[in-house]
From Swiss-Prot:
Job description of the protein: Cysteine protease inhibitor which inhibits members of the peptidase C1 family. Does not inhibit asparaginyl endopeptidase. Required for the uptake and/or processing of yolk proteins during the development of oocytes, probably by regulating the catalytic activity of cysteine proteases cpl-1 and cpz-1. May play a protective role against exogenous cysteine proteases derived from soil bacteria or fungi, or rotting fruits and vegetation.
Recorded GO MF terms: cysteine-type endopeptidase inhibitor activity
Species per Swiss-Prot/TrEMBL record: Caenorhabditis elegans
Name listed for the protein in its UniProt record: Cystatin cpi-2
InterPro entries cross-referenced by the UniProt entry: Cystatin_dom (IPR000010), Cystatin_sf (IPR046350)
Subcellular location: Cytoplasm; Secreted; Cytoplasmic granule
Gene expressing this chain: cpi-2
Distribution of this protein across tissues and organs: Expressed in germ cells, developing oocytes and sperm, sheath cells surrounding germ cells and oocytes and in the eggshell (at protein level). Expressed in the pharyngeal gland, pharyngeal muscles and some hypodermal cells in the tail.
Keywords of this entry: Cytoplasm, Disulfide bond, Protease inhibitor, Secreted, Signal, Thiol protease inhibitor
Similarity comment text for this entry: Belongs to the cystatin family.
Annotated GO CC locations: cytoplasm; extracellular space; vesicle; yolk granule
Sequence motif Secondary area of contact, location on chain: 70-74
Site positions per UniProt: Reactive site: G24
Length: 143
């Protein structure tokens, strides 16, 4: 009886340790890493193509607030990105031309939170962006 109890405790311990390292599971990342900021800038076109940005100015990334990755026939990166109204007016340049050097965030401009999912298969030179607005953000809200 004592041997069965010891075996059960060891089995539970092994299962608990391995559950924290689930293969193929989503892994939280440090959202402040430059690679995630770069990915947010690459998603600018998708963010601005959303019908929810119907103002006269393009949105630009302010900050990546959350990041996670998952291995799924490539790598799926999920970002939560705070964006703000920039000083770049629609019609004066194309959304894919927006960069951090030519578009700055407007003081007092509108802000929103978007979820950006990037599916990458580097060996196939494949990259797919999915963008979804989460919600509008008030000017005094801190991240």
């Amino acid at each position: 009886m004592k041997a069965i109890l010891v075996f059960a405790l060891i089995a539970i311990s092994i299962i608990s340790v391995n559950a924290g390292m689930m293969t193929g599971g989503s892994v939280e990342q440090d959202a402040s890493q430059k690679e995630y900021s770069d990915k947010a800038w690459k998603a600018v076109k998708g963010i601005n193509d959303q019908a929810s940005n119907n103002g006269p100015y393009y949105y630009a990334p302010i900050k990546v607030t959350k990041a996670s990755t998952q291995v799924v026939a490539g790598i799926s990166t999920k970002l939560e990105v705070l964006v703000g109204e920039s000083n770049c007016k629609k019609g004066e340049l194309q959304a894919h031309e927006i960069t951090s050097s030519n578009c700055q965030i407007k003081d007092g401009g509108s802000r929103a939170l978007y979820q950006v999912t990037i599916w990458e298969k580097p060996w196939e030179n494949f990259e797919q962006f999915t963008v979804e607005k989460i919600r509008d953000v008030t000017a005094d809200e801190q991240f």
